[in-house]
Every structure is written in structure tokens, then in C-alpha cells.
Amino acid sequence: MNKIIKYSIFMALLLLMLQSHAQAPEIIKGTVLQYNNSKLEAVPYANVFWLETQKGTSTDEKGNFTIEKPGKNPSHLVVSFVGYKNDTIIITTDKKEIRIILTNNTELSEVTITGGMEGSYISRLKPIKTEVITQAGLNKLACCNLSESFENSATVDVGYSDAVSGAKQIQMLGLAGIYSQLMWENIPFLRGLSSSYGLSYVPGSWMESIQISKGTSSVINGYESVTGQINVEYKKPQTAKPFFLNYYISSELKNELNVFSTHKINKNLSTMLMGHGSFMGTKWDENNDGFMDQPKLNQINLFNRWAYEGNGYHSILGFNFVNENRDGGQMDYDENIHRNDTVKYGIGIKNQRFQLFTKNGFEVKGMDETSIGIQAAATYHKQDVYFGLATYSGTQKSLYLNAIFQSELSHQHLYSFGFSYQYDNYEENYTKLKSNKSYDTSYNRPRVESVPGVFAQYTFEIPEKLTVIAGIRADFNSYYRTFVTPRLHVKWNITKSATLRASAGKGYRSASVFSENMGYMASSRTVMIVDELDLEEAWNYGINLSKCWEFKENRKATFTIDFYRTDFINQVVIDIDHSMHHVDFYNLGFNNTGGKSYSNSLQAEFNIDAFKRFNVGVAARINDVKVDYLKGTMEKPYVSKYKGLLTMSYATKYEKWMFDFTLQLNGKSRLPNMIMSPAAPVYDNYSPAYAFLLGQVTRKFRNFDIYIGSENISDYMQHDPIMGASKPFSNAFDASMIWGPIMGRLFYGGIRLTI
């Protein structure tokens, strides 16, 4: 704990010193006013930002603000406030002080950006259906990291992978998160060794937005997207506030500190340094099974990037370093005493990850709408894990390169082409001992994949009416084979407020069975790879309709409905039904099991501003996911058959107080066949449906916010999440059968400081 506090103080002082050396920028001062019964009054806490950069501030209690002037002239300054139309002012070089009067004018201005940031919305501009979770939406929850950022979303499900490691996993369209391509600002991010624990490597306070798209994505981004894509946008040094600090503490005494600072070197060059520290050193056992409900944890996460913006050229260069340790198991487990015996059961998880990245864009002079983009990243990841007598060590070395040329034949005909290269070098070792210390099983699986690829994409567009994107790519995988990935996306604006989208395409991925399925190590099951695993391959088809209505006072309502189907040509099947003593991995169709594996997902969502500053959202989803196993065609385990979602948000005048509430209704899911186990609880082959409630209250001040909240308000918990907890080295032990909450009611609080 003392190390975390010392580190946090050091980081805060360092970033403040860096900020103090920034060059003095040119400042615009102003006041925002409104008419009230023919009298002018100040408008406190209005949003003020530059249109070109979205760099902004807010007014104080007297309606005053100061903002740094961008280098470009003239510049457009936008002022927005809930209940008023935006005002846009053209700032020239001679303007130092301005006065802005907001009115309730119902006529649309030239700039039609809505006042007040929505928590989430469906982008009407993108051909691929994309749900955007904004900064405002992220602030409605504690959002300690990426895994906790989807509680308000009906698209993504989040749950624990096991009852001892604290790791969370996601699902989309009823399939595991590994089939969704996870990106950081359009660079492949969490893959390979990061699959099981990587969601915690993305602190919530670092994120500017999350973009969730269903179905296959553009061929420009690669071939791995099967069910969708999750792209995370971090805060930028060009637009972020100079200094930010967020401190969080929970009723379980988990502490988190996020701090960052931006530094503008000159009008073209800027940098940002981010630091994150999380610490949990207290042991808890709410269900009295003798095991820690959450492991002890400490994580240090550093991120630095430099951004250069010149005439026709921009570049980003940076690095990310993560060091995380988790220690758990039985309450009285001591690693120094019990590490190699069968007296007490313990777990240890150590991760070190380092990544370098760069993004570059060039405008081609003399050619309209023509540019070249180059992205590159290098990643090193070391992982050492043990669960009782099962141990795993893995190393990943990866390189990524993507080069894109984009131009147009005319305003209606755009094209892109380029090449990519993905290199992955895995060294994985897995060993499981029996209780008498004899070998149960052992695997040494080195794997090197060198994948050069080429792609081309054509876009036909009738502005405000129709967009068609057809893409194809070919990749040669040195470990597997050459494969071709076709994809098609269509967007039709039926009316100005109704949009129909459709998509179809293929996706491929290579499975890393150990690093992607760490949860099964928390059991007595033996890993059995009974087939020569092939490349996973699937088709995905989808259609969705969205409709928007606009009302007075800037209120609106939206309705979306979509259906997506995924058909696997080949899948690495994870079979935990064939035997309770091992987990089998094999290709779809192995041993004449058939060749069917599919997912159907139907979802509808309605969101409305019921009245001024009060928003209500309701959503419902149905999943139908089945796989051909050795025992026949069965529903995929741990996939909820349905889900309901209710969200409510209310803000007082000037958004001084904000109240957010979420209710999830999670449907039943099939449990694996455990009839032979005397330790198995009786659920009639299905888990029960349950409700999960969250709430948060935020008080906003000039430069800081205070928030308090609660998760799992109803205190609903899965009974006996660890089978055979009293005999962890017996064949009856299994901590991987998780279908519901394993933690009880939790309270938290925190402060966000922005300077």
C-alpha cells in the first residue's frame, strides 16, 4: 500500500512539474449569458469548445471561461448548454474577449451539434452500425477499466471467467470476446496472452470513447473480426485538459489512482503522460467457502505518447507498459510455505507487457482526398501463472504493420488499398501434476505465425442516401495456409431519420487455447488437445434498422433493432460436457460429431429523453447459440438465452447533480453436464435468471467531481461458486462454473479533478 501511495504522489508531482513548463498560450476570455424575463443572467457550467479540435472547457458559476486559442485562424468556437441551441462564433486574430448570449431559438443553425453530451448513441454517419459510448457514458459508472465499461450496454455481456482469479470476460452476439476484434485507436490491441486479463489493462479514466460495431469490420483493419469490433479511443494530448486526477476506493478497500498531464511543446508538437496504479491487499470471503472472493492485486500502468500535427502530415509515437500481479486462493494460503504442497490451494498470476506504437498520416499534394496512412506496433508480453498444481508460462512477441493508400475517382467513388503484416511468436508451456506430484499432463506449444496480406476496398456513396462498401483481402499464414476474406457493408438512409444497414463477410482467427481459457485452470480438469487445431473460420451476416425522433427542448428518441447470425466453417470447440475430469479442445466436426456451430442474436433498443435532463433506455436481446459436441448438438454453456436492460439518467439544472441507475435482467444459461459430481449444486441443467442493479450519484463542481455508487445493489450472488472447495486437490474441485455474480453488494466513491 505504501509503495502505491509513494508512486502516486511521485507521479502527480512529476506531471504537475511537466505542466508548469508549458509555453504560455494565447488565451480567449469570455462570458456566456442567457435571457430570463428580459434580463441577462450568467450561464454556469456551459460547454465551450473548438469545433476543429473539440478542445474545450466549461464556464464557472458566473458564466466566465478562459480557453487556449488554437493555431488556426479563423477558428470556430462552439458554446452548448442543455435546453439551448448551440452558438458558434468565428474567432479571428484580434478577438481577446467575447460575450455570448444563448437563446431558445428553434431554428437550426449552420452547426448542428447537440447540446450536452449523450452517454451513448448510434452513429448515423458510419456504414457499419456503431454504438459509441462517450466520456459522459463512461462517467455514469465507476469504470475502473474496460471490463467494467459495458454495464449500460445491451450489446456486450461481462462476467467472471472463474471464482478465484478476478478475471472478467466479455461476450458479443452470444460468442466469447475472442471473436470480437479489440482495437486501440484502430491498432489490434488485446490478443494472444492478453486475452484473459487484458481488459483490466485499459483504465477507464484514460478512455475518451468506446466504439462497438457488430458484424465483420472493414478489411482495412484485418481478418480477425467475426462477431464485431471494439475500438477504444484514449484521450489525446491535443484536446485533453492540462491535468487530470481520479481517485477511487471501494468498500472492499480496492484503491485506484489515475493521473495524466498534457504538455504543449509548440503549436505542432504535444505530449501526454498517463499513470495508473491499482491496489487491493485485503482478503475477503463473503460466502465462507474458505477461498478469497477476489485475489490480492497490484498493477502499475504507464502510457506516453507524442503527437505532431503539421501541414499535410500528422504523427503519433508512444509506448505502454503494464506490470500486474494477482495472488489468491484459500484464505490461509501462504506462497512461501504452501507453493509446492497439497495442504493449501493458491494461485499466482504475473503479467508484464510492453508495447511501442506509431501512427502516421500524409496528404498527397496535388491529389484531392488522397492520403497515405501507416500504422505500426511492437508488443512483448510475459505471463507466469499457477493454479494449485497446474502451471503455465507464456511469452508473446508480436509485430504489426498496416499501410493504406486512400483516394477517390470522384466524390461518389472512393477506393483504398494497401498491405499489412502480422508476426506472432508464442512460446507456451503448460504442466499439471496429480496430488501425488506425478505428471498428469504437459504441453510445450511453440507457434510462429508470419502473416503478410494485401487488401482493397471500394466505396460507392450517394451523399445522405446510400453507401456501399465492398472489400476483399488475401493473407498468407505461415503456420496455417493462405485465405481470402470478402466483406460487404450497405447503409441506406430511408428517410432523414431512418437508416437501414446490412453486412456480410468472413472472419478468421488462430486460437491460443491456453492463454484464452485460463479460467479452466481453476479446476481439477485436465487439458486435452485431441485434434490438430486448425484456423477458425466463420461467416457473419447482419441487418439492422434505426429510427430517430426529435422533440422540443433538444429532446429526442431513438429505436434500433438488429439481427445477426454467425455460421462457423471451422471452430476450435471447447468441450466441458464430455467429461467432468477434463476439458477437450478439437476442431468442429471432429470424430464425426457433425459440423454445425452457429449463433443467432436478435436485439431491440429504445431510448428517449422523457423530459428535460431525464433519459430512459430499455433494451431486450435473445440469443440462440448451439454447437456440435461429442455428445451431440447442444446449447453453448454459460450463454444467457435472453437479456433485458433498463437505464435511467437524470441531471439537475446546470448538471450540478447527476443520478444514474441501471437494471439488468440476465436470463438462464445452460450449465455443463455435471451429473457425476457429488459436489455439483442442483440447477436443473440451467442457471436461474437474476437481476443485477447498479447506481451512481455525481456532484459536479467547477474543477472536480465527487461520485458515490453501488454495484449489485440487490446483493444477489451465485451460491457455492467453487465446487469441492473443501477439497481443492480432489477430482471434484471446479472454480470455473461461473454464471452469475460472485461478489455481493459493493459500495464505492471517488473524486475526479480536472485543471
Region annotations inferred by a language model:
Residues 570, 665-674, 697-755:
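C-terminal beta-signal and adjacent terminal beta-strands/loops
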Residues 65-68, 187-214, 302:
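Short acidic/polar hinge/loop motifs at secondary-structure boundaries
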Residues 371-385, 493, 501, 534-592, ...:
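Membrane-embedded beta-barrel scaffold of Gram-negative outer-membrane proteins
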Residues 68, 147-191:
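Extracytoplasmic beta-strand/coil segments of soluble accessory domains associated
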Residues 33-39, 44-51, 80-84, 94-139, ...:
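Short, acidic, small-residue-rich periplasmic hinge/interaction motif at the N-terminus
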Residues 280-301, 307-372, 378-396:
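Flexible loop and strand-edge segments within Gram-negative outer membrane beta-barrel domains
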Residues 96-101, 146-149, 168-171, 183, ...:
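N-terminal periplasmic accessory domains that precede
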Residues 463, 564-567, 586-674, 752:
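Gram-negative outer-membrane beta-barrel transporters
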